[in-house]
Amino acid sequence: MRGPAVLLTVALATLLAPGAGAPVQSQGSQNKLLLVSFDGFRWNYDQDVDTPNLDAMARDGVKARYMTPAFVTMTSPCHFTLVTGKYIENHGVVHNMYYNTTSKVKLPYHATLGIQRWWDNGSVPIWITAQRQGLRAGSFFYPGGNVTYQGVAVTRSRKEGIAHNYKNETEWRANIDTVMAWFTEEDLDLVTLYFGEPDSTGHRYGPESPERREMVRQVDRTVGYLRESIARNHLTDRLNLIITSDHGMTTVDKRAGDLVEFHKFPNFTFRDIEFELLDYGPNGMLLPKEGRLEKVYDALKDAHPKLHVYKKEAFPEAFHYANNPRVTPLLMYSDLGYVIHGRINVQFNNGEHGFDNKDMDMKTIFRAVGPSFRAGLEVEPFESVHVYELMCRLLGIVPEANDGHLATLLPMLHTESALPPDGRPTLLPKGRSALPPSSRPLLVMGLLGTVILLSEVA
């Protein structure tokens, strides 16, 4: 019986060696990937503005008629769906604001970007998955990209300041230059790049305003500069580019006699509420005081024809939103164009999002071009939850558990890009293991035990 014991000892040594568990390929043989998000770019923003660079990208690559974001259609939740492939109830970033119903702490959007425990709550985004499989990743202003996940930070990251000017076109180009250097000088494989427009302009002036149209022209010029930069850095044949967004935008209805105002509802009082998250577009959450859930629900369920109020367990499953411990016992949203006012009226935006993701004004864009994508292809609409699986395929990495389906977007790719290399498992760079670090000690212990038993038998 010494022969099997020797073989198992060799297997144990192999498992402990660097790169065990994965076929080997040389560094640099996989195409790189750049995911760009222009916040709040509604699906039809290119239809009332001349956008020659976005049009050229569609001719050279793939265009979706539109993309359906996750619900709730907010910036951070929808961006995290893109990089995890999970619906919001499953990845847990349920709001732009960090909140705690026990301490009553609520933090605004920019502060929440740096709250590690808000983001790192069980889901592993694509940056970390890529790095664990031997790649190098970067995040430039992308929501969630500057905190650690299970103790791992993104290779390179930048976070904007609280008073950041999202409109500065000169800075946009400088940011692109930095990202190109990350690819060429630091050999990053994946970068996510975020721009805060046309969302800010849409909020301030409204989606039908001339200011929004001018901002879309700026976005288009930036797309042109980006593609020129890719060519100038000799990346055209080895970098796949995806341009998308988190959600759309709609015009806010400000008619004084038709507002959704909690402080004017006759049978409702904030004295029954332990915690509230209101005055954030069309969405709201309430934690009633103990024993007052039914009273609050009865007061609100028919309080306004444009307001939809649900107990958590009755919230429509199609939204894939409410089944998360961070969601309060009562939650609500309003119809398209209506925002929810709480104790006083503090919302004055002309444009807003956060509405039902089935509303066309919440739909957004998807464009892709590069060596893996077909040219001149327009595809039918799809959900943003599928983009993660596509990106993992483009990078040649094994995805985490997710809610997307790779088959949904495979028709975008050339046949050779749609299939695993030679039908074999995903290849990893030299010196890295496909086995998660947490699983290797268990395998080692199992093999050691087998070796000892066989030695005793012998």
Curated annotation (Swiss-Prot):
It is a single-pass type I membrane protein. It is found in: Cell membrane. Residues 455-458 are cytoplasmic. Inhibited in a dose dependent manner by ATP, imidazole, orthovanadate and zinc ion. Not inhibited by ADP, AMP and EDTA. It catalyses: a sphingomyelin + H2O = phosphocholine + an N-acylsphing-4-enine + H(+); 1-hexadecanoyl-sn-glycero-3-phosphocholine + H2O = 1-hexadecanoyl-sn-glycerol + phosphocholine + H(+); a 1-O-alkyl-2-acetyl-sn-glycero-3-phosphocholine + H2O = a 1-O-alkyl-2-acetyl-sn-glycerol + phosphocholine + H(+); 1-O-octadecyl-2-acetyl-sn-glycero-3-phosphocholine + H2O = 1-O-octadecyl-2-acetyl-sn-glycerol + phosphocholine + H(+). It comes from the Eukaryota. Residues 1-21 form the signal peptide. This is Ectonucleotide pyrophosphatase/phosphodiesterase family member 7. It comes from Homo sapiens (Human).
